[in-house]
Design a protein with these regions (language model features):
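Short N-terminal signal/transit or membrane-insertion segments
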Residues: 3-6, 81-89, 95, 103-105
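Extended amphipathic alpha-helical scaffold segments
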Residues: 26-32, 38, 68-79, 109, ...
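Acidic, Ser/Thr/Gly/Pro-rich intrinsically disordered interaction regions
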Residues: 1-55, 125-225
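Flexible secondary-structure boundary motifs
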Residues: 95-135, 151, 155-156
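Secondary-structure edge/capping motif, primarily at the C-terminal ends of alpha-helices
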Residues: 72-87, 116-119, 152, 217, ...
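A structural signal for well-ordered alpha-helices, especially hydrophobic packing surfaces
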Residues: 58, 62-65, 69-72, 99-102, ...
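A glycine-rich, hydrophobic loop/mini-helix early in the fold
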Residues: 51-92
Length: 225
């Protein structure tokens, strides 16, 4: 990947385009979206553009894995003490974000397989069975994301108990419900954090397989001469 990225500097106009984009990002408050008519998209030659798609989409897959793994720490922390965001709401939101990462990975993987086919025509790489394996491995997460997107918010018995015990703690202070609420929340978030860590490790394994397959099918532009 690094070798290919460095090779782009030999493309006429690319280094200048990158510098101009960095300037626009740095000074975005002072500039129009496209100052002086500068193009916002760099046009590579078709072959280089297809190779560039492979690299950028691979990096997007890596970013999705990193985002899914970071959910472990969202589960571990409740940063809204004293604010109008309940523990129940925070936990539900993080669960939904976590599930969404697996759908995101699957959809990006489909797009990535198309980029591989375009950049390396005639290769014998078939992502179909691999995507099916991914769908089977993460079936629970993908089903939960589908349910959230099309029907209702995510909940389970533990999260529902956090919601109810929180209501009772507010309405019946000193009756033991606050301790019950906090204990259930700590136990449940610990379990979710562990799940995020374990599922993140499985995503890492999938990325290793993708990297090996990519190097095999795209060795003509992803190896160092």
């Amino acid at each position: 990947m690094d070798a290919f990225t460095h090779s782009l500097n030999a493309q006429p106009g690319w280094p200048e385009f990158q510098r101009a984009r960095l300037r626009r990002t740095r000074d975005f408050d002072d500039l129009d979206p496209s100052p002086n008519g500068e193009p916002e998209i760099f046009e590579f030659p078709i072959e280089i553009a297809r190779q560039h798609d492979v690299v950028t989409l691979y990096l997007e897959l890596l970013d999705t894995v990193s985002s899914a793994k970071s959910c472990e720490y969202y589960f571990r922390r409740y940063p809204f003490r004293g604010l109008p965001v309940s523990r129940h709401e925070h936990l539900s939101n993080v669960c939904e974000m976590f599930f969404g990462r697996f759908y995101q990975f699957k959809e990006r993987l489909k797009k990535y397989s198309g980029a591989i086919a375009a950049a390396s025509p005639g290769n014998d790489l078939d992502f179909g069975p691999f995507i099916k394996t991914f769908s089977t491995e993460f079936d629970r997460e993908l089903r939960a994301r589908h349910e959230i997107h099309h029907h209702r918010r995510f909940s389970d018995l533990a999260i529902d108990h956090i919601f109810i015990s929180g209501l009772l703690a507010d309405r019946r202070p000193g009756n033991g419900w606050n301790a019950e609420h906090l204990a259930t929340y700590r136990k449940t978030t610990h379990e979710w954090a562990l799940r995020a860590k374990n599922r993140g490790a499985r995503l890492d394994a999938f990325m290793e397989a993708i990297a090996e397959a990519t190097l095999h099918s795209c060795s003509h532009f992803l190896t160092i001469p």
